[in-house]
Each structure stands twice: as structure tokens, then as C-alpha cells.
Swiss-Prot record:
UniProt source species: Saccharomyces cerevisiae (strain ATCC 204508 / S288c) (Baker's yeast)
Major localization listed first in the record, in broad terms: membrane
TM regions (residue ranges): none
Its biological purpose: Involved in peroxisomal proliferation. Promotes peroxisome division and biogenesis.
The protein's name: Peroxisomal membrane protein PMP27
Length: 236
């Protein structure tokens, strides 16, 4: 009876569904990768460092052909000529193109790790650096989009607050609902801004433009991994 209760519990069912797809597993492995990276520095653990490397490699397998998702998304955003905000549209196009390039170059890194291609200056140094640059440009496009959304939602809130104070009855309730949505949009944009900024902190350290403590870089990865898992959990 207890076993049945656990097996059929909604949370367990949701968790199984969360891990059923490669995207959910990749998010969990990303969290484990950065946790291992943090423990490797904190405890000078060789095992944690080895686990970090293994989690990183497995994630590369799970992201195989994922660039196609971003290319399709970029094409859809580009074709959406009726978008309400062209700044957001352009940022979405650029973000997905750069992420597609980043993930494509990362597949070369996987082939190098598997020793399918030889380790050369190109495959061992230049391509990993180009990959990080594409990741950074994708994040910068995301940051620009986040700031634009914050600006837009803030302007909407100011307008709705003014309209709400002058409305009555049913109209007042309608303005209240719209205002609530505007506040939610602003919160979502602020959350995404923090997320993209934390990931940018990681990649800037990867590129050598920052030389922060390894613990802080690892913790940034842990935080952004949790944010990604939260979004995926809500969508499950």
C-alpha cells in the first residue's frame, strides 16, 4: 500500500516525466557537473574533478543535434514580422543563432574528447575558445532582450497604474488583472537578467577576461542550473 502510494504519487510521476526526456537529464547533469566542480576545489578532490569531466562529456552527448532546435527557433522569430517588439525579435534571432553556433562547435569538442579527431591547435585551443565566444554573444543578446523587456514592462506598469486609479467597477478589475500580468512579466525578465548575467560571469572566466575564484564560478553554475531546472519542472 505504501509502495503504491509512492509509485502513483503526482510528484513522483512528474519527476519521472521530468527525467524522461534528454533535456531534463541534461539539466540535472549540469547541476551535478558544477557541484562536482565546486567540491573539487573545496576539498581538492580528484574524484570530484573526474566526475565533473564525466558529467561534462555525457552532457555533450545529450546535446547532440540540439543546434537544430536553435536554428529552427531563430527562423521562426525571423519570420514573425508581426511581432509587437522588433528589438525583442532581433535579440531572439541573434541569441538562437549564436547558441546554435556554440553548440555546433561544442560537438567538435566532443569528437576531440572521443579521439575521433586529433588534438591540434585548432581543435584543442581555437575551437573551444570560439565556442565560448559564441556562448558569450548569445548571452549578451539575451541580456539586451532582458533589459528591453524590463523597460517595456515598467512602462506598461506605469501606464496601467495611472489607468487603474481612474477606472471604476468592472473596468477597474480588468486593469488590475492586466497590471498583475505586467508585474509578472517584469519579474520574469529580471529573473532572466540575473540568470544570463551569472552565465556571462562563467564564460568570461572561461575566456580569461575575469580571474575569479573557482568556487564562485562553480556556484554561479549551480545557481543557473537550479533556475533552468525550475523552469523545466514548471513546464512538466
Amino acid at each position: 500500500m505504501v509502495c503504491d502510494t509512492l509509485v502513483y504519487h503526482p510528484s513522483v510521476t512528474r519527476f519521472v516525466k521530468f527525467l524522461d526526456g534528454s533535456a531534463g537529464r541534461e539539466k540535472v547533469l549540469r547541476l551535478l557537473q558544477y557541484l562536482a566542480r565546486f567540491l573539487a576545489v573545496q576539498n581538492s578532490s580528484l574524484l570530484a574533478r573526474q566526475l565533473q569531466a564525466q558529467f561534462t562529456t555525457v552532457r555533450k552527448f545529450l546535446r547532440f543535434l540540439k543546434p537544430l532546435n536553435h536554428l529552427q527557433a531563430a527562423a521562426k522569430f525571423y519570420d514573425n514580422k508581426l511581432a509587437s517588439d522588433n528589438v525583442v525579435r532581433v535579440c531572439n534571432v541573434l541569441k538562437n543563432i549564436f547558441f546554435a553556433a556554440y553548440l555546433s562547435l561544442d560537438q567538435v569538442n566532443l569528437l576531440r574528447i572521443l579521439k575521433v579527431i586529433p588534438v591540434t591547435v585548432l581543435t584543442g585551443k581555437k575551437i573551444p575558445r570560439w565556442s565560448n565566444w559564441c556562448w558569450l554573444f548569445g548571452l549578451l543578446s539575451g541580456l539586451a532582450m532582458d533589459l528591453r523587456k524590463i523597460q517595456t514592462s515598467h512602462a506598461q506598469i506605469a501606464a496601467f497604474v495611472k489607468a487603474k486609479s481612474q477606472s471604476q467597477g468592472d473596468e477597474h478589475e480588468d486593469h488590475k488583472k492586466v497590471l498583475g500580468k505586467a508585474y509578472q512579466d517584469r519579474y520574469t525578465a529580471l529573473r532572466r537578467l540575473f540568470w544570463d548575467a551569472a552565465d556571462s560571469f562563467i564564460v568570461l572566466n572561461n575566456l580569461g577576461y575575469l580571474s575569479s575564484n573557482e568556487e564562485y564560478v562553480a556556484l554561479s553554475g549551480v545557481v543557473t542550473s537550479i533556475l533552468g531546472m525550475q523552469d523545466m519542472w514548471k513546464a512538466t
